[in-house]
Design a protein with these regions (language model features):
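Conserved helicase NTPase catalytic core signature
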Residues: 1-58
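Conserved helicase motor core of SF1/SF2 NTP-dependent helicases
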Residues: 43-335
Length: 335
């Protein structure tokens, strides 16, 4: 009948249109030529032949400090002018190689060098600029991040108001110490680690937080960050046993949290051993990312002994711990 015929013709038109969109590179090229703004990943732009004949007036690359040199060059060669946006004091490029293959270690180390950092350190004058106002964090948290990681510049905190949470029991920055708790040491699991005492302390804090928020009928986003996959799995398992109506919780590793933000961040250190071995937690950039995700409240859970002597040249937890005990107005050590 006429109705079926109409729907069939409509279907044929849509099918032809879809085929043109998915298969006709010339059709894609015409659309792209008329576009003022195109979004892509660094490597994704090389996946389409239509970009081979296009030169952009501007190429803006976000999170440029995390990209390897080859990844950055893919979009950079397609632009007349380049803007790189990033933070070389946060996570570096990540390259996956077989750690046991000695022949690849030199290549791996080379690829993990940040072109963004190299350019930042070598370029002078008006060719680079530093953003000096942060709009994410409460001023107490922002001041700490500025002092610990960006002391060479004065970063202004925005006037945006951030409310206080659990202000009688906690400060905007709190460290819950597990050193005096039984069984506070880490447990190895394959190549990863977990810490049951830190998981217990985290659940206790979430209970307190949810109870406090329920009194005011307010919901908050919570990010729980761990440097180790075994701890992430443990935390995920423990959190799933509870139902907190006023908490929207995300649990992930440090790498997954870069670029994200939550009202409250809980950072689970995990490492706690007699040798005071920090593993890759000794990388200050990873700690910077973890601590700077918080908007209103930052809670660190772990053994304060990590802030003492370690067999490494650098221990980023030492100056963090010293800042906390030196600023009782904004910070609190809970033992």
């Amino acid at each position: 009948d006429n109705t079926n015929s109409f729907h069939y013709k409509k279907y044929e038109v849509i099918k032809d249109w879809y085929q043109n969109l998915s298969q006709n590179s010339q059709f894609e090229l015409e659309i792209i030529k008329d576009a003022f703004l195109i979004g892509s990943t660094c490597s994704g732009i090389a996946s389409y032949d239509v970009f081979d004949n296009i030169e952009f007036d501007w190429v803006i690359i976000d999170e440029a400090a995390r990209a390897t040199v080859p990844e950055l060059l893919i979009p950079m060669v397609r632009g007349k002018r380049i803007i790189l946006v990033g933070d070389h004091k946060q996570l570096p490029p990540v390259v996956n190689f077989d750690e046991n293959d000695i022949s690849t270690k030199e290549v791996k180390n080379t690829l993990e060098e940040s072109l963004f950092k190299t350019l930042h350190d070598s370029i002078t004058g008006d060719l680079k600029a530093t953003l000096k106002t942060q709009f994410r964090m409460k001023s107490e948290i922002g001041n700490m991040i500025n002092k610990l990681y960006y002391s060479e510049v004065e970063i202004n905190n925005s006037t945006q108001h951030k409310e206080y949470i659990l202000e009688d029991e906690y400060k905007p920055i709190s460290w819950i110490d597990t050193n005096t708790s039984p069984d506070h040491n880490e447990i190895s699991e394959g190549t990863s680690y977990k810490n049951y005492q830190e998981a217990t302390k985290t659940i206790q804090f979430l209970d307190e937080l949810n109870d406090s928020l329920s009194e005011h009928k307010r919901k908050k986003t919570v990010g729980i960050i761990s440097g180790y996959e075994a701890q992430r799995i443990l935390l995920d398992s423990e959190v799933n046993k509870h139902k907190w109506n006023y908490l929207d919780i995300v649990i992930n590793n440090v790498d997954a949290f870069q670029g994200s933000e939550k009202d409250i961040i809980i950072y689970s250190i995990v490492r706690s051993n007699q040798d005071r071995d920090l593993g890759y937690l000794k990388d200050e950039r990873r700690l910077n990312v973890s601590l700077s995700r918080a908007k209103e409240m930052l809670v660190i859970v772990g053994n304060t002994k990590v802030a003492e002597y370690t067999p490494y040249e650098t221990n980023p937890f030492i100056k963090l711990f010293n800042y906390i005990i030196s600023n009782p107005k904004d910070c609190k050590l809970i033992q």
